[in-house]
């Protein structure tokens, strides 16, 4: 590349350009005016170097390469995309000074006329500087590099495209009436625009490169910055700038009630919300004591006042709420609702009580006959009706024939076998006690029949009964006959059982599982006896422990307490069975 020297002469002289290392023909001679488009950018660049006092002066080893092409002849379209920054090389590191990459991040465009230099790099003339767009002006680029810091340069695009006004030290617009913010750099101007709520919602949003009108810019300027008089700029301190964001705070006060506490005194809505969960006429939450019995749903709906009364007062009101006995077929409904008032205060000694379907009131006493005096407080005297009195002779007859819960039981077996029986429901337990029979599954019947035959009368075969999910054993019976596989009892709650054998009930009492859980069976993976399957055999030594605990346990409840209830259920099931058989015919 040949070295060319250009004489800088005043504009208008017609001197020729002298070129070294070559001759010039007449057709190659050019005037100074021909270099005007190319020399304009070089002239601007000669005055664009920062002073020596700038702490961010670039290293003089980094060459300054100008952009060799001019965009003065290119057409300017306002509908194009945003300008792409001109990426330059890295500045050299020297003397420990800070150097930055003068790319699109730091090198920000200046006025619309040209781009200000950054760290000694040449500007990039994004907007053309010909006469067609002389209204924008380029005079602001000459003294722009004389600012105190390299960070003072900021965007010079039209204010509507950036949402703020042009700061001091930037190039303005030739025919624009915008006034500059005095003494505020780009960083300070950015801080003034930090507003939480923002009152510039009405401002027109523009993108870089769109057409702007002077009236639109004037309206935006009035919304973004306060009006400044044409007098001398007043020095602005940081304290004054810090006070500016506090102006829109009164508009944000309603937003503070949402839940973000910004003030020292809570707003009234928060105080009102603290009363959630209380009654409208009272200020305290009405809660029942932890030890108070839980009232049934009907009692709470009818009279909510007993919630805060002592338990004796609550129990005394129950006969008034249910003065008339319901129909016999409704016996199963009211009794479970009234039973908690009677049983729960006195049944603290019960452990792992099965809540369903045992809690149906002490309609019968296991030591004496049935009578109206045996009904507890709050229990509806349903069994006193003529239809329920028919059940009492059945229980009395059973107690007269069988000596239930004997005190002289010999649990120390020398020869015998013991099996676990798991029943699906207490209905079948009731009918087994009533008819002295039992039936297991097909596999269970075979196992029990083989065990009974193996003893050959040399010892008893005891069955330990427990209902699935009850949490207790309900009694002990002795197997008295072999299994009749062809017999069909027709009394069970489910019609799928086939076969039967005779049993004799010895103990009828509820023994909680926690009384027997410590006894483990080595023939059942060392599991507790309470976790056994149906017809699971208990080894003789472990069976002695189980029989001893059941025989000596002082029980408080048994299935006899609900005997009348299960009698009524059996009558209903038989009536439904007869109805189905009649429909089949």
From Swiss-Prot:
The record marks 157-158, 538-539, 570-571 as: (Microbial infection) Cleavage. Keywords: Acetylation, Cytoplasm, Host-virus interaction, Phosphoprotein, RNA-binding. The lineage of its organism: Eukaryota, Metazoa, Chordata, Craniata, Vertebrata. It comes from Homo sapiens. Residues 1-52, 243-277, 304-351 are annotated as: Disordered. One of its GO terms (molecular function) is RNA binding. InterPro entries: YTH_domain (IPR007275), YTH_prot (IPR045168). This is YTH domain-containing family protein 3. It comes from the Eukaryota. SUPFAM superfamilies: beta-sandwich domain of Sec23/24. Residues 15-24 have a biased composition (Polar residues). The modification N-acetylserine is found at residue 2.
């Amino acid at each position: 590349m040949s070295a060319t020297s250009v004489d800088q002469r005043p504009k208008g002289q017609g001197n020729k350009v002298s070129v070294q290392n070559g001759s010039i023909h007449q057709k190659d001679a050019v005037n100074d005016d021909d270099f005007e488009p190319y020399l304009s950018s070089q002239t601007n660049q000669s005055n664009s170097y920062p002073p020596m006092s700038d702490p961010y002066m670039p290293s003089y080893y980094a060459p300054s390469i100008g952009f060799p092409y001019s965009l003065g002849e290119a057409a300017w379209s306002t509908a194009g995309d945003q300008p792409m920054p001109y990426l330059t090389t890295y500045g050299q590191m020297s003397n420990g000074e800070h150097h930055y990459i003068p790319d699109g991040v730091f090198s920000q465009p200046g006025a619309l006329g040209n781009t200000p230099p950054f760290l000694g790099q040449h500007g990039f003339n994004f907007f053309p500087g010909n006469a067609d767009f002389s209204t924008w002006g380029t005079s602001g680029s000459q003294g722009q590099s004389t600012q105190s810091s390299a960070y003072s340069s900021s965007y010079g695009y039209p204010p509507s495209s950036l949402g703020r006004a042009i700061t001091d030290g930037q190039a303005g617009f030739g025919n624009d009436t915008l006034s500059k913010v005095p003494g505020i750099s780009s960083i300070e101007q950015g801080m003034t625009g930090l507003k939480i709520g923002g009152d510039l919602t009405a401002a027109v949003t523009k993108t870089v490169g769109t057409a702007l009108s002077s009236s639109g810019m004037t309206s935006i300027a009035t919304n973004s910055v306060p009006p400044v008089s044409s007098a001398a700029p007043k020095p602005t301190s940081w304290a004054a700038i810090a006070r500016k964001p506090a102006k829109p705070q009164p508009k944000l006060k309603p937003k503070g009630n949402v839940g973000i506490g910004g003030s020292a005194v809570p707003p009234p809505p928060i105080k009102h919300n603290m009363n959630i969960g209380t009654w409208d006429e009272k200020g305290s939450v009405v809660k029942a004591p932890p030890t108070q019995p839980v009232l049934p749903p009907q009692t709470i709906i009818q009279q909510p006042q007993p919630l805060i009364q002592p338990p004796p007062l609550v129990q005394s009101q129950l006969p008034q709420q249910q003065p008339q006995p319901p129909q016999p077929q409704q016996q199963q409904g009211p009794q479970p609702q009234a039973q908690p008032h009677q049983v729960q205060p006195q049944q603290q000694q019960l452990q792992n009580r099965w809540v369903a379907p045992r809690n149906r009131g002490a309609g019968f006493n296991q030591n004496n006959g049935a009578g109206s005096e045996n009904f507890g407080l709050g229990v509806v005297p349903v069994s006193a009706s003529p239809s329920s009195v028919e059940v009492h002779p059945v229980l009395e007859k059973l107690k007269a024939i069988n000596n239930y819960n004997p005190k002289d039981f010999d649990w120390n077996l020398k020869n015998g076998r013991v099996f676990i029986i798991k029943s699906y429901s207490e209905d079948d337990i009731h009918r087994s006690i009533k008819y002295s029979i039992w039936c297991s599954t097909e596999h269970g019947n075979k196992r029990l029949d083989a065990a009974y035959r193996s003893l050959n009368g040399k010892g008893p075969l005891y069955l330990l009964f427990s209902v699935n999910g009850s949490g207790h054993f309900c009694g002990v019976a002795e197997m008295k006959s072999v299994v009749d596989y062809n017999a069909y009892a027709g009394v069970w709650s489910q019609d799928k059982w086939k076969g039967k054998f005779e049993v004799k009930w010895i103990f009828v009492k509820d023994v909680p599982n926690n009384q027997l859980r410590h006894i483990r069976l080595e023939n059942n993976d060392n599991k507790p006896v309470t976790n056994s399957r149906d017809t699971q055999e208990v080894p003789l030594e472990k069976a002695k422990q189980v029989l001893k605990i059941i025989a000596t346990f002082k029980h408080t409840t048994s299935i006899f307490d609900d005997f009348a209830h299960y009698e009524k259920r059996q009558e209903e099931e038989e009536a439904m069975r007869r109805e189905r058989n009649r429909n089949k015919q």
